């Protein structure tokens, strides 16, 4: 019997959780500053949702999904990405009927993909993302990009670059598709078996192939930018103008198509350019989608969003030597110097905690010196010593663990003393 972690998963131990809390808090604060509200969706959905939403020609659907049958014979899939579930909820709960548009939502949830585990890539991973539904204005595209860039600035990741592209509207993509088929078809035998299937199913996916990405025919493939109609060109120009107005630098990569079938018009990636982190490591990716709500049974509703892999962000912070704020420090360790002080120790610790002061005590009946050593090990700012004299007088010995200074403080003033000291920090 194998009782160890399944491959591609990991435990987040207590000493690591503060890093996750830091990212989650910063992301929440940035999103809510932009007036995005949190949404939470089920960890599994009907398989058809992802087949229709993500696209059955994508690697995600064809190779990476965790799919199973429940006891009722229904095909269910652990969610591999966030957008399809959010859009499904948008349609199912008729959020498109809301007076205030666009509907702006963010999420922070586990996703699952069966792929080879490596640095920053796990089979269970956490994705933070946003979706803005109900506006086809290019300014919302730039708001979404700006939010992502602001999040990276807040957490200290500045060695990054923004890469954008346009996939155009349906008319533009159809013309580009025809050109791709004509370009690849005479040489399709030079490509992997999957790309040979993709040629007539969805040739755009050939540009995104992991096996053939170095093939010169991909590098010389017709650019989508040459097939944009007048409307799509104008849309992309507006996106670029807004980015310039916000002084957000960007590069254009016409080969960037993203790994999902639902995108149109704007697509973007934010990449790390940190030395030693790997060339073009994508930290955030997203884009615009116009047909997904209709595909799920709702009215024509445009959308725009992105996803960020938390594990990859943590790795990027580590590579960049960015220090993440530590967990909340232990402010007071209450030392009970004799058994008779135990009851008072329990009530004092409880009183401190109820007043917002982080407090701890010994639970192993250790001797005085062992408790003092434990307080040091836990980096307590202060200790309060409860001995026979303290129990009789009601005055406690408050010791500053950094300076060694010690003073007697009455029970009635101890909370005020600690609160004042806390405010000075």
From Swiss-Prot:
Q: Which Gene3D superfamilies match?
A: Anticodon-binding domain, Bira Bifunctional Protein, Domain 2
Catalytic reaction annotation: tRNA(His) + L-histidine + ATP = L-histidyl-tRNA(His) + AMP + diphosphate + H(+)
The yes or no answer to whether the keyword ATP-binding is present is yes
Q: Where are the transmembrane segments?
A: none
Write out the GO MF terms.
ATP binding; catalytic activity, acting on a protein; histidine-tRNA ligase activity; transferase activity
PROSITE patterns given in the database record: AA_TRNA_LIGASE_II (PS50862)
Q: Give the chief site where it resides.
A: cytoplasm
Q: Which GO terms describe its cellular component?
A: cytoplasm
Q: How does it assemble?
A: Homodimer.
Q: What is this protein called?
A: Histidine--tRNA ligase
